[in-house]
Swiss-Prot record:
The lineage of its organism: Eukaryota, Fungi, Dikarya, Ascomycota, Pezizomycotina. Residues 1-23 form the signal peptide. It holds the Pfam family FAD_binding_3. It comes from Emericella nidulans (strain FGSC A4 / ATCC 38163 / CBS 112.46 / NRRL 194 / M139) (Aspergillus nidulans). Belongs to the paxM FAD-dependent monooxygenase family. Its cofactor is FAD. Induction: Deletion of the conserved eukaryotic csnE deneddylase subunit of the COP9 signalosome leading to defect in protein degradation results in the activation of the silenced dba gene cluster. Expression is positively regulated by the dba cluster specific transcription factor dbaA. Expression is also controlled by the transcription factor flbB. The keyword Oxidoreductase applies. InterPro entries: FAD-bd, FAD/NAD-bd_sf. This is FAD-dependent monooxygenase dbaB. The gene is dbaB. FAD binds at residues 37, 107, 320. It is an enzyme of class 1 (oxidoreductase). Disruption phenotype: Does not lead to any phenotypic changes.
Length: 393
């Protein structure tokens, strides 16, 4: 923002976790913002599945959020009864014995749907708004105009694309080829498992929250994490309390025989077949998956960031739009929060410091590009190393 356009808002495209975090930071600082989301409110909430871990970015998230929201994060943990400063285990799936243990550190494993709802509290979000184009005019270089497919438009001092891994903002910024996602030679499927306390007990013995591992002979990788517990899913005081977990498997794609089946039934059969040689507790948990289970084909892709033309400092990217990465390191959300914190600091500095003659245009993209490029490559390599070595989470 320059001094000639002090009231133009920051335009945030995408009401995902990172976009909402940035919006909260700007609102907290009294800086005008507008959030636009492609999907409807109902579809946006429906798309927030499973859970995520906030670890090294906890301080950055606290910086972005008002205290009353940050203090409620512990309430939306997948199991608020746990002190989540536990170790993180990478198992030999044939024995369920840890091969590698990452030391305990402060972290919060939170339900994604509840986190999205919390981050959206008090924000004005414009739904059903799909990006068509953006334009920075030579006549008005201190602003950017965004046009949507419904024919409406808006003008702001900065456009931040937080529209996910398949970001339209990124593809418009760099072109379709340079902005396209990179498919990886790995196949992955995932499902939700619902368990009674008795069914969950054997898994809880391994770890009550999350673990991952690989089988030394088949190379099949598996991730388990708790998604909800009776305390947060409303079943605590009912006759049938239950736990929900997230199960993901992946394997290297070498030929067509490694392809993911087309139907839920066939994917479920493959999920169970892959677990045949897992340690008994893991195998039996997977064998109990009901025949009508929905098993998702998770398409693993990434995008390693490169320098982009930020249109004179008026257009930038954050979160998955800036550095789509695989989930093996468990860091994507944390890097997105770090992006939001860094951008909000720069925006606040430009907004409050008349000495920054370029205003928002002075805010650098380089930390996002250089550091996140390294991390995206490491996340890509983590799956290839999973069979033999530790994954640093």
């Amino acid at each position: 923002m320059t001094r000639t356009s002090p009231t133009l808002p920051v335009i945030i495209l995408g009401a995902g976790m990172v976009g909402l975090t940035l919006a909260q930071a700007l609102k907290k600082a009294g800086i005008p913002y507008e959030v636009y989301e492609r999907d409807s409110a109902a579809d946006t909430e429906k798309g927030r599945g499973w859970a995520l871990t906030v670890h090294w970015a906890l301080n950055a998230l606290e910086e972005c959020l008002p205290a009353e929201l940050f203090n409620r994060l512990e309430e939306i943990q997948v199991d608020p009864t746990l002190d989540d400063s536990r170790r993180f285990c990478f198992l030999d799936l044939s024995t369920a014995i840890p091969k590698y243990v990452i030391p305990p550190s402060k972290r919060l494993r939170v339900n994604r749907r509840l986190l999205g709802n919390l981050l959206g509290e008090g924000l004005d979000i414009n739904y059903n708004k799909t990006l068509s184009s953006f334009h920075v005019s030579p006549e008005t270089p201190d602003s950017v105009t965004v046009t949507f497919t419904d024919g409406t438009s808006t003008t702001g001092c900065l456009l931040v694309g937080t529209d996910g891994r398949n970001s339209k903002t990124r593809r418009l910024l760099l072109g379709e080829e340079a902005g396209a996602l990179n498919p990886l030679p790995v196949r992955s499927i995932g499902t939700t498992i619902t368990m009674t306390p008795e069914q969950f007990a054997p898994i809880r013995e391994i770890d009550p929250l999350l673990f991952q591992g690989s089988h030394p002979e088949t190379g099949v990788y598996m991730w388990f994490s708790l998604v909800s517990s009776p305390t947060i899913n409303g079943s605590k005081d009912t006759p049938n309390p239950f736990y929900e977990g997230q199960l993901i498997q992946s394997w290297l794609y070498k030929s067509e025989k490694d392809a993911v089946p087309e139907t839920d039934a066939d994917r479920l059969a493959l999920f169970k077949n892959n677990a045949q040689h897992f340690q008994r507790r893991l195998r039996e948990a997977i064998e109990t998956l009901p025949e009508d289970s929905k098993v998702l084909h998770i398409k693993l892709v990434d995008w390693v960031p490169v320098d982009w033309d930020n249109r004179g400092g008026r257009v930038t990217l954050a979160g998955d739009a800036a550095h789509a990465m695989t989930s093996y390191r468990g860091e994507a959300f944390n890097h997105g929060v770090a992006d939001a914190a860094m951008l909000s600091r720069n925006i606040i500095a430009a907004w409050t410091n008349p000495g920054m003659t370029g205003g928002i245009a002075d805010a650098p993209d380089s930390p996002i590009v250089s550091k996140r490029a390294k991390i995206a490559r490491e996340a890509r390599d983590a799956r290839a190393r999973a069979k033999l070595s530790e994954i640093a989470v």
